[in-house]
């Protein structure tokens, strides 16, 4: 990873999408496109974000399966935020499997949580509970653990009806 990509990724992680865009706005390589897509999503331009993430995923080579999978997860998150529940769940499952296979536990867990949230939105409580049961929240950072507990609470609330 070159220094501009690293700096842009750190800016995004620190909540500075404009700083990230400053570093990669004119670049067309797949890592830059992916970071631009994430930055645009953080800024609320979801259509452009999806397009950039798709271009990035197509641009990553066969040896960059993890990068492609991360793009799929990011695109799935955008679809969920947009309430586009018709996005391909199989693509998210495949991305999650790839991430798990390559040891990216954090992004694999995030993909699992996205699947759970989608299943909750479409009313498939049993499936959501099954997926959630397979996710271990302990090694996750606090924000991801909180998302896990919110999903558990969401299932419990729907079961009360």
Give the residues covered by each predicted segment.
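Residue-level signature for tetratricopeptide repeat
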Residues: 10, 39, 78, 118, ...
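Residue register of alpha-helical TPR repeats
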Residues: 2, 31, 38, 68-70, ...
